[in-house]
Amino acid sequence: MNPKIRKPNNSSSKKVTVSVLSVFLVFVFVNTFFYPSFYSDSGSIRRNLVDSRESFHFPGNFRKTKVYMYELPTNFTYGVIEQHGGEKSDDVTGLKYPGHQHMHEWYLYSDLTRPEVKRVGSPIVRVFDPAEADLFYVSAFSSLSLIVDSGRPGFGYSDEEMQESLVSWLESQEWWRRNNGRDHVIVAGDPNALKRVMDRVKNAVLLVTDFDRLRADQGSLVKDVIIPYSHRIDAYEGELGVKQRTNLLFFMGNRYRKDGGKVRDLLFKLLEKEEDVVIKRGTQSRENMRAVKQGMHTSKFCLHLAGDTSSACRLFDAIASLCVPVIVSDGIELPFEDVIDYRKFSIFLRRDAALKPGFVVKKLRKVKPGKILKYQKVMKEVRRYFDYTHLNGSVNEIWRQVTKKIPLIKLMINREKRMIKRDGSDPQCSCLCSNQTGIIHGV
């Protein structure tokens, strides 16, 4: 016997259908008369989403940032190179920029002087009409100027005079005055570069290696860009692993430094007697550079200690050498941390922990060869970011970082124009203060 099949309640079904239809008609009525733009714009919104995805995946499609590079008087660029050489030249533009750890100013300048067809993958495009520019680049060789001044005392060259002259020239420019320099980009790689005039250029996006010599109202992670030193030794191209690396740890540099660099002398005393640790004094010279290359290429770990400032080119030499950096520098700032996680190829040690007898070598001896190999593989992937000669290296990444500042630049320009000037006795800066909790994440 078949069970009885219940017939649907037709009146209930009709009521549900009528209710759904009524809600739909009300929705259409409201959106048609009160929110018509939703429908008219939906196609463009959808297209914009597709366009943005395509731009993200295909770099050639996005709008490049337009950068105007000032045609500075030659005494701020090639004239500084001429002063470094000490001999007059009929054509200063033919002079070669001398090699040193702050060559970023040269690479950025030369990048903008290259034909556009050779700047493949760059997020910026150079424009020659300042009215078209999103940003303005000031190409003064401020770090080289310091070298010339300190290297030839009594020669008659003054870096401070160069700084004053540069800023006076800038302040006479219409485009600088328009927004108080906020849409300008200035490289000041050496910690003392532009120190005398920093208060007059602090509104600009500063390209710096650290913030150690800058006040909180002069430099910040929000406004400025941390850039890498130019590494001085050849990259390691040999076999990965520890087979060719007979030293546990390597360091070569000045033993005695001021302020935060005092940790060097203490660590020298702790480490110099360890049998497979190479730690010795040395200043910059061709002979010592060869010794550094040999030491870094044959060591598993390379020690990075704070000097007069927390940063140094030694870290980037280590990465180029695939020598695992051991960083003992509590306040160090590192470049490009939005795309690079340094913990994946570096070991960070707190200063107080590193100064405990036996702590450093004991910790490093526990790192297995397989772990070192993983560190090396990551370094090999990321080291292009620290190579100014790489087609998609430091230069492109610096421009990308600068481009990301544009929304903040526009915000600050508009905000400044409508706000009453505040009392200068309480300076404020749009500053990102990292790790406000005070929690220490190093070992």
Swiss-Prot record:
A Gene Ontology cellular-component term: Golgi membrane
One GO process term, biological-process aspect: cell wall organization
Keywords from the named record: Cell wall biogenesis/degradation, Glycoprotein, Glycosyltransferase, Golgi apparatus, Membrane, Signal-anchor, Transferase, Transmembrane, Transmembrane helix
Gene Ontology MF term list: glycosyltransferase activity
Annotated transmembrane regions: 16-36
Matches recorded under InterPro entries: Exostosin, Exostosin_GT47
Topology of this chain in the membrane: Single-pass type II membrane protein
Pfam families reported for this sequence: Exostosin_GT47 (PF03016)
Top EC category: transferase
Main location: Golgi
EC numbers, comma separated: 2.4.2.-
Coiled coil: none
Subcellular location(s) per record: Golgi apparatus membrane
Spans within the Cytoplasmic topological domain: 1-15
Residues with attached carbohydrate: 75, 392, 435
PANTHER family membership: ARABINOSYLTRANSFERASE ARAD2-RELATED (PTHR11062:SF307), EXOSTOSIN HEPARAN SULFATE GLYCOSYLTRANSFERASE -RELATED (PTHR11062)
Family: Belongs to the glycosyltransferase 47 family.
Entry function: Probable arabinosyl transferase responsible for the polymerization of arabinose into the arabinan of arabinogalactan. May function as inverting enzyme using UDP-beta-L-arabinopyranoside. Cell wall pectic arabinans are involved in thigmomorphogenesis response of inflorescence stems to mechanical stress.
Protein name: Probable arabinosyltransferase ARAD2
